[in-house]
A protein has these predicted regions:
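N-terminal loops that bind phosphate or other acidic moieties
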Residues: 1-323
Length: 323
């Protein structure tokens, strides 16, 4: 094929080969770990649906019936839903129980959680990544489910980057213009009340973040430490990735940006991470679905590397880089 013919996909294949020390990257078996948690900020009316939806979707994930589960099945990817902070006392079949607490506080009034709780959630994420490595998975992605988490991710992004709330707050699952304005005000209020320290990602997450963001942050730290390539999902995933990179810059070498979400913070987060997404499809579903779409494209991109003959084998002069 022509040099650079697969564009960004070729860049990712080269990155994967470097991470794995394999001439042809191996991206099977692969796993998606989905962190499910509730956010007290829903009390501010920043979402279209109620908090109970988190528990419903978490239960469906355990039964293999969510959007992400359907997409993952089509690309032969294992899905591990994790209850890291769903509100209420539940025991979901098929869901890993790593609950730290039953939802967070309302960040427009108080810190989301204590520092110790944030650290515990990060540690749970690290442990889950280590479990993936021990089970032999060669590629991982992280996802989330939690009503209100585009509000917390906007607050965390603003705190880590210094960007104004108006630049990083989006419509989430579907807010009106009036609802979006209210959401921006809530993000601004949460930052003013909690005063997160921008140079301390744990402080930021504990004050204005969520348990899903904390768990994902740990998951990315753990996966990188285990040498696993990580396919990022959307805005919440990238928010956690930035927190992980701020804690350990080497994590960035293991991150692959699948897509740029419709949420306004996504482009800024990818820029901060130094990543270029290879899908721009206006997606904003979450759960890891954007990562799943990216992995499907990587399967396609790897096929010629595995199966095509070389230029020597077909008697054609190879392309040469032109200066």
């Amino acid at each position: 094929m022509p040099l650079g013919g697969l564009g960004l996909l070729q860049d990712v294949i080269i990155q994967l080969a470097g991470i794995q020390r394999e001439p042809i990257p191996i991206i099977r078996p692969r796993a998606a770990v989905i962190f499910c948690a509730d956010n007290g900020v829903v009390a501010e009316g920043v979402t279209q649906c109620g908090q109970d939806v988190t528990a419903t979707v978490t239960r469906n994930m355990g039964q293999g019936r969510s959007t992400m589960c359907m997409m993952a099945k089509s690309i032969d990817m294992h899905v591990f839903p994790v209850d890291i902070g769903v509100a209420g006392k539940f025991s979901f079949k098929g869901v890993v129980d790593k609950k730290i607490r039953r939802g967070t506080e309302n960040i427009a009034e108080n810190a989301a959680m204590t520092r110790d709780e944030a650290i515990a959630a990060v540690k749970n994420g690290i442990e889950l990544a280590e479990n993936c490595a021990q089970q032999g998975f060669r590629l991982v992605c992280g996802g989330e489910m939690g009503i209100g988490n585009t509000t917390t991710s906007a607050a965390v992004t603003a705190a880590l980057t210094g960007a104004p709330a108006s630049h990083v707050t989006g419509r989430g699952a579907g807010l009106s213009s009036e609802g979006l304005y209210k959401k921006m005000q809530v993000v601004e209020k949460s930052l003013a009340i909690n005063r997160p320290k921008s140079d301390d990602p744990i402080d930021v997450i504990s004050k204005v973040g969520g348990l899903d963001i904390a768990g994902l942050t740990g998951f990315y730290l753990g996966a990188a430490a285990c040498g696993l390539p990580i396919v990022l999902d959307g805005v919440i995933s990238c928010t956690a990735a930035l927190a992980a990179v701020r804690l350990c810059p080497l994590v960035a070498d293991y991150l692959i940006a699948a897509h740029c979400s419709e949420e306004p913070a996504s482009a800024l987060l990818l820029q901060e991470l130094g990543k270029k997404a290879f899908i721009t499809a206006g997606m904003h579903l979450g759960e890891g679905t954007g990562a799943a779409a990216g992995i499907a494209l990587l399967d396609l991109a790897l096929a010629p590397y595995r199966e095509m003959p070389t230029f020597d084998e077909i008697g054609v002069e190879a392309y040469k880089p032109l200066k």
